[in-house]
Amino acid sequence: MAFPTTSAQQAETNRKILEEIQTKKQLLAGGIINLGLSPPNQMPAPQLLGQPTTVNPDFQAGVGIATNATSTARSAFNPTSSTTLGFFIPQDSYFGNSFIPVLPRLEPLPSPATTPTTPNAPPSHSISK
């Protein structure tokens, strides 16, 4: 019989699973897994409105991206961070949000009620008796 028996297949599958678990335990114990946190000196400076956004080469190369980020997230990170006014902080998340957006604060536009009026303007309504 050329095919392995089902018990041999099950034993092989179990062995592979146990090896994978052991490898993950060693990585966690050794602190090798990157949590996606970067030191504050690697954070890009916030940009002002109207100025082109420049990306830190480490972030553009994917160094700041968490190692467990999917390839889709990595491919979305680079173009997005180079075309936005803000920047993104990579993080390790179990909920799928691998990047936190950081947007600049904008000054509020002046409201029409606070605009100065001319003193010689005619009154808009008159009172009649």
Curated annotation (Swiss-Prot):
It comes from the Eukaryota. GO terms for biological process: DNA repair. It holds the Pfam family SOSSC. InterPro entries: SOSSC. Transmembrane segments: none annotated. GO terms for cellular component: nucleoplasm; SOSS complex. Residues 105-129 are annotated as: Disordered. PANTHER family: SOSS COMPLEX SUBUNIT C (PTHR31526:SF2). Belongs to the SOSS-C family. This is SOSS complex subunit C homolog.
